[in-house]
């Protein structure tokens, strides 16, 4: 998927709307809002767009009906019907550019946390795709642009009964070995610090708690009592 430099998909809709308004002012096209399209027909080289009150004829038609993601806004799936009636083959609509539900028990704990990360999708234990960017942890699972980018692959795989797994690397700029070295160096200066205090500045506190818990390191354990294995397990969780 491609985004404009603004990072907002709505910019595309705004650009199209402004161009339509410009052409309408020049009387080159007819502009109509809140008008339900009943049918799109092709007769020879001419397309006819029928509404309740009038019919528009043109040499080309763009079907941009918004799928069926928002019926309240008019996105009722009519575009699929129009496409079929015009002879197009329509594949089954599935969610895309969306968040992903996760089974992890601590997903609620991380709700609201944002973090740059690498998102790697595995389907039936085979690498499918990896994306980097800001990941947003939600009560249901994961969101954010890199998650949106992989979501369409998740939808197709689940439809076919395949197994999906997403790995998150919340510190993609470092290898596990480099992270171990960071923890060792911090240990020289932070011997009396405990728990999330040791990871201050590296990760949000909520995420630090989860990472330490998964590594089996007690939040009450001082850095001086960490073992080399603790550092290795924590680096692996990150």
Model-derived features with residue positions:
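A glycine-rich dinucleotide-binding beta-alpha-beta segment and adjacent secondary-structure elements
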Residues: 33, 209-237
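Core beta-strand elements of the Rossmann-like FAD/NAD(P) dinucleotide-binding domain
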Residues: 32, 50-60, 130-133
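An anion/pyrophosphate-binding glycine-rich loop and adjacent beta-alpha core
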Residues: 89-92, 99-222
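Short beta-strand to alpha-helix junction loop
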Residues: 1-18, 70-74, 101-105, 223-230
